[in-house]
C-alpha cells in the first residue's frame, strides 16, 4: 500500500530535515506544506527528499492541512498520515499507526 506522510510546517528549519529523513524510512513519500515560513524550512525540506508546497503567507495549520489533503487526494495514496513539523511525533510510531489499515 502506498503511504504518504503530510507535514504542515512553519519556521521549522531546525527539525524538518531530520523529521523527513526519519519519516521516509516508514512511508513511500513525504509532502510538506511550508505555511509562509520566514526561515529555510522549504530548502531543508526539499534537500531532505520531501515534495514541498509553499504558501506565500502564513494561513494557519488548518489551511496547511487542507492544502496537504488536496494534494494527497490527487496523489492516489492508499494511506495518508499527518505529522506535525515540530518533531514531537516519533516517525517510528508510524508502523503501529498504519498496521490495522494494512491488515
Can you describe what each PLM-predicted range is?
Residues 1-103:
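Structured catalytic core of nucleotide-sugar glycosyltransferases
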Amino acid at each position: 500500500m502506498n503511504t504518504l506522510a503530510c507535514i504542515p510546517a512553519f519556521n521549522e528549519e531546525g527539525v524538518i530535515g531530520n523529521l523527513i529523513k526519519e519519516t521516509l524510512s516508514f512511508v513511500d513519500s513525504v509532502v510538506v506544506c511550508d505555511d509562509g515560513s520566514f526561515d529555510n524550512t522549504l530548502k531543508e525540506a526539499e534537500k531532505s527528499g520531501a515534495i514541498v508546497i509553499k504558501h506565500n503567507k502564513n494561513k494557519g495549520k488548518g489551511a496547511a492541512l487542507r492544502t496537504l489533503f488536496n494534494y494527497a487526494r490527487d496523489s492516489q495514496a492508499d494511506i495518508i498520515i499527518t505529522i506535525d513539523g515540530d518533531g514531537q511525533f516519533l516517525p517510528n510510531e508510524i508502523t503501529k499507526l498504519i498496521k490495522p489499515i494494512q491488515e
